[in-house]
Regions:
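Glycan-recognition surfaces in beta-rich domains, encompassing non-catalytic CBMs
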Residues: 1-282, 290-299, 313-314
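Intrinsically disordered, low-complexity terminal tails of fungal membrane proteins
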Residues: 301-330
């Protein structure tokens, strides 16, 4: 998505199998007339599956941290849909493969919640949601360069307590998935970044996951009606990049919790993108260096003169027949 004002988002896509989505009702029989149903139901297919419904009173809610959001999908037939967020009702005007897009405010420090509800539907009509596209929270209130990298679950920087390594079924950036079925099991690490995502399996056997960053806790229910090999389990709010953060992920209720990989994002505050900004930074740096050099030269000259005066105090006394310095003749 294009941005409406200068900032550096953390862009990512997510499908409705993620715990960030809440769908109701869900048709386990994959019958769209009864509620939301996925386009496929196998664990390897669900990470990219679309979800459809023809049922009146079907609802979808999506929570995210960030500025902008767009929901991709389509509508077949005639449907009346109510769309709103925490600030009120949003105009529902789907076009092509995009159901709606929403520009955020001038900050990304709040968690947003988008909800849609099917109010009425003609026979044979159907609403399909393929994915959400998010310009996520990063605390980057200008256009800055940024780094993005993946930390697989078998990385040495991660410290586990009670988790068991298994071969990753998803193979989406990590060869290993660490799994826990005991309350209190945890994984921890330190990081310096602007934001992060956590990926892993989700499904009926999964439970509560607690994520703690520098003492701030959030609990996520990773249980879903269908089993999926790869889900976006958690999106963090933007973080202060000037600090080294402590991250802890815990199994809360003893149900299954799997960690496949972490994805981190970090803005480079002192390297604005664009040639003009680069030249401006270069000029500022040269000015600072020049000022430091000038101050050093002045200090050296002053010290040398002070040493000479101490070694030859007669040199500073005025000669006879003169009043003061030569250039002060009256």
């Amino acid at each position: 998505m294009a941005v409406a004002f200068p900032y550096t988002p953390f862009p990512f896509n997510v499908t409705a199998i993620s715990p960030s989505f809440r769908l109701s009702p869900v048709s386990v029989a994959t019958n769209v007339s009864l509620g939301w149903a996925p386009s496929c139901a196998t664990p390897e297919c669900l990470p990219t599956a679309s979800w459809s419904t023809s049922a009146i009173n079907s609802t979808l809610s999506f929570k995210y941290w960030g500025w902008d959001v767009a929901l991709d999908g389509n509508v077949k037939g005639n449907m009346s849909v109510d769309l709103f967020n925490e600030e009120g009702r949003i105009i529902w005007n789907p076009s092509g493969d995009k159901l709606f897009s929403l520009r955020g405010g001038p900050d990304d420090h709040l968690q947003r919640n988008i909800t849609l509800r099917v109010l009425d539907a003609s026979p044979g009509s159907q609403l399909t949601v393929t994915r959400a596209r998010v310009n996520g929270s990063s605390r980057g209130d200008y256009t800055w360069p940024a780094d993005r990298w993946i930390v697989p679950s078998d990385n040495d920087r991660l410290s586990y307590s009670g988790f068991i390594p298994q071969t990753s079924v998803a193979q989406a950036g990590s060869p290993t998935t660490y799994s826990s079925s005991t309350a209190g099991d945890s994984v921890s690490m330190q990081f310096n970044g602007s934001a992060f995502l956590i990926y892993g399996p989700c499904g009926p056997t999964n439970g509560l996951m607690r994520v703690t960053v520098d003492g701030n806790q959030q609990t996520v229910n990773t249980s879903k009606p269908f089993a999926s090999d790869d889900c976006l389990l958690f999106q963090s709010p933007g973080q202060n990049i000037h600090n080294l953060h402590q991250l802890v992920v815990e199994n809360v209720d003893g149900r299954t919790l799997g960690i496949d990989r972490f994805e981190f994002f970090r803005i480079q505050l002192y390297q604005r993108s664009g040639s003009a900004n680069g030249k401006r930074v270069a000029v500022i740096l040269c000015t600072i260096v020049g000022a430091i050099v000038l101050c050093s030269v002045v200090i050296v000259i002053y010290v040398r003169r002070s040493v000479k005066r101490k070694m030859n105090p007669e040199a500073d006394r005025p000669r006879a027949g003169h009043r003061g310095f030569m250039w002060l003749h009256l």
